[in-house]
Amino acid sequence: MMSKDKPQIPSGEKMLDIPEGLWTKCPGCNRFLYTKELELNQSVCHYCQHHFPLKAPERIACITDPGSFIECEKHLHSVDILGFNGEKSYQERLDYYRNKTALDEAVVCGSCTIGSIPVFLCVMDFGFLGGSMGSVVGEKITRMIEKSLSAKTPLLIISASGGARMYEGMFSLMQMAKTAAALQRLSQAHVPYISLLTNPTMAGVIASFASLGDVILAEPKAMIGFAGSRVIKETTQQELPPGFQTAEFLLEKGLIDKIVHRKELRSTLKQLLYFLT
């Protein structure tokens, strides 16, 4: 009688030791991508063109002239002004994300050139506390607006945020009015402001400076809105249009000016800056 035992793997063979992070699964098409190739492609899927998140330094490298970026306001740091208590203190969270991201805050600001045109630049990083806007984020952005106004130099803000930072309470909500007021002065002086919305741009950020650009761009399929769809549905008791918080829906309704593929972003910005300056 033949044995029905399962074949045994020879003891001499070992499982392959695959380094962690070698492959990345695309949420758009579920394919596995070689991480190094993905990074060389500006973190855009080769197959479905899904745009993965970028860290602030990566975004800066993608759009600025090489070696032109000079960081400003790096000395500003958030503090736990309210003594926020939770599972972890606010200070513990700040320390954790500073170590994790090698950033001081959720926004990196500075001066640069794009196509040899001087620009003041603010780039938010969702990896730092969800890109949330606290008092320091609001202050850094406001200072860059004021620098732009003083130098009559175009301003570019790249948003990636879940909204206001709850650990700072009203201090974070105040930044909405502060940044909006500063942008009003910039507008009155006819200094160009370009806003780029990336995935996600939500809540207090889209309700303030992110939606006030002279030109508003967005990355493909970026999630953009004030509240989450579940909250809106429960509040209004109405069925919501499919994809109503995507860049494509907002473009159709006229709330943004153009959707720009990441590979075309630098050339698009160069053209816009040329026309606006």
UniProtKB/Swiss-Prot annotation:
Query: Which keywords does UniProt give here?
Result: ATP-binding, Cytoplasm, Fatty acid biosynthesis, Fatty acid metabolism, Lipid biosynthesis, Lipid metabolism, Metal-binding, Nucleotide-binding, Transferase, Zinc, Zinc-finger
**Reaction(s) the record says it catalyses:** N(6)-carboxybiotinyl-L-lysyl-[protein] + acetyl-CoA = N(6)-biotinyl-L-lysyl-[protein] + malonyl-CoA
Q: Is the keyword Nucleotide-binding assigned to this protein?
A: yes
Which cysteines link up through disulfide bonds? none
What is any one of the record's Gene Ontology cellular component terms? acetyl-CoA carboxylase complex
Q: Does the keyword Lipid biosynthesis apply?
A: yes
Cofactor requirement: Zn(2+)
Q: GO molecular-function annotation terms?
A: acetyl-CoA carboxylase activity; ATP binding; carboxyl- or carbamoyltransferase activity; zinc ion binding
Q: Which residues bind Zn(2+)?
A: 26, 29, 45, 48
Report the family membership: Belongs to the AccD/PCCB family.
| Summary of subunit composition and partner proteins | Acetyl-CoA carboxylase is a heterohexamer composed of biotin carboxyl carrier protein (AccB), biotin carboxylase (AccC) and two subunits each of ACCase subunit alpha (AccA) and ACCase subunit beta (AccD).
Role of this protein: Component of the acetyl coenzyme A carboxylase (ACC) complex. Biotin carboxylase (BC) catalyzes the carboxylation of biotin on its carrier protein (BCCP) and then the CO(2) group is transferred by the transcarboxylase to acetyl-CoA to form malonyl-CoA.
Q: Which NCBIfam families match?
A: accD
**Under what name is this protein listed?**
Acetyl-coenzyme A carboxylase carboxyl transferase subunit beta
